[in-house]
Design a protein with these regions (language model features):
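Positively charged n-region of N-terminal signal peptides that target proteins for export
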Residues: 1-5, 122
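Absolute protein N-terminus
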Residues: 1, 19-20
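Sec-dependent N-terminal signal peptides
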Residues: 4-15
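Subset of outer-membrane beta-barrel
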Residues: 20-360
Length: 360
């Protein structure tokens, strides 16, 4: 669907300010966009994640974002144990696309992360179960604990493009309509110079009995690369600062509680999200693994509440969420529908933590 010529002025205004990163309501299902130190923090040997977000579905489909990522542990034995449990090493990569204005403005990203997770302290009596599922050896874990620190570094490549074929300009107006075959005179706007961006993060982890906690901080775009359709060195991609945390615990032999939250700040804009999910163990065996039903709810700043429903079947997981808008944005959009779909596939192996979280 062709847009009106006024769209170009909106695009110019948008790129004249510091651009912001696309994000997901299911931030917990997109760990590589939250903290590079979360790379290879997996309940398994490796992990593939695919996220899709469609915001305000309807005529023109204003916003659409998708990712696919792969991360894994390295320097492991055949059984999935690290050669050196005192230092765990992992790598990962991600590709992302983001479209807005009915697909006229397109952004593509690729990133690579590396992480090292170092044991700070291990109290005798603590023994990691190694399974992704609910079973705990209380005799070994009752008095034990472990503390670890993860350090992650990342490098990303970004490129934005304006598809002029999906826009109409004043030069194309014939008096009775728009002739898209006519020149626009705006070819200089179609391409933005690619950029490289650096990121870094830390994650502190604490495990004891049937409780696991992660606390992390990260900074993206440390080098603040230039990003604009016009030649203006003052327009750059602002640093994004992230603080996040999560807690997992067993409430019973069949019920797992996971809570988490995130705070992000970029270019003077900040937002937070907090919530949790309850997992119910349905069934499982050595062949197919565990079947766990997950249901939860998150609160996103003053903008939306986000119900979530998912299921884990062995090493495969699917999660679906829907943003229920609570702000005045709901009045501005005729169909303020925003949904996200996440698919996760894990390779069997030793878990990074004692307790299964639905996104690890």
């Amino acid at each position: 669907m062709k847009q009106t010529g006024a769209i170009i002025f909106w695009l110019m205004a948008m790129t004249s300010s510091h651009a912001q990163d696309p994000g997901f309501s299911q931030f917990f299902s997109s760990p590589l966009t939250i903290n590079p130190a979360l790379t290879a923090n997996i309940n398994g040997k490796w992990r593939v994640i695919s996220n899709y977000r469609n915001q305000w579905s309807g005529p023109g489909n204003p916003y659409s974002t998708g990712t696919i990522s792969y991360d894994r542990k390295i320097f492991q034995n055949v059984d999935g144990n690290y050669v050196d449990e005192n230092t765990r090493v992992g790598i990962g990569g991600m590709m992302m696309y983001d479209e807005s204005t009915g697909g006229a403005l397109k952004s593509n990203y690729a990133s690579f992360n590396a992480t090292a997770n170092i044991r700070l302290m291990k109290k005798e009596g603590y023994e990691q179960n190694g399974a992704r599922i609910r079973h705990i050896d209380k005799a070994n874990n009752e008095e034990g604990s472990e503390q670890r620190l993860g350090v992650g570094l990342g490098l990303s490549y970004g490129h934005r493009r304006l598809d002029l074929n999906k826009l109409n300009f004043g030069e194309q107006f014939t008096g009775t309509g728009f002739d898209t075959n006519l020149p626009t005179g705006e070819t200089a706007l179609s391409e933005m110079k690619p950029y490289l961006s650096a990121s870094a993060g830390l994650v502190y982890s604490y495990s004891k009995n049937n409780i696991h906690i992660d606390l992390g901080v990260a900074t993206f775009h440390i080098n603040t690369p230039n990003q604009t359709f016009i030649k203006d060195e003052n327009q750059y991609l602002a640093r994004r600062y992230v603080i996040h945390g999560n807690l997992e615990t067993f409430l019973s032999d069949r019920i797992i509680l996971t809570t988490n939250g995130v705070y992000q700040n970029q270019a003077g804009a900040s937002y937070f999200s907090i919530g949790g999910v309850m997992g119910y163990y349905l069934a499982g065996n050595e062949v197919v693994g565990d079947v766990i039903l997950n249901a939860g709810l998150w609160y996103w700043s003053d903008n939306a509440v986000i119900p979530y429903l998912g299921i884990s079947y062995g090493n495969f997981q699917v999660g679906l969420s829907y943003d229920i808008t609570t702000s005045t944005l709901n009045e501005a959009a005729k169909r303020a529908n925003t949904f996200e779909l996440c698919l996760i596939l894990r390779g069997r192996g030793k878990a990074s933590g004692v307790i299964p979280a639905p996104w690890k």
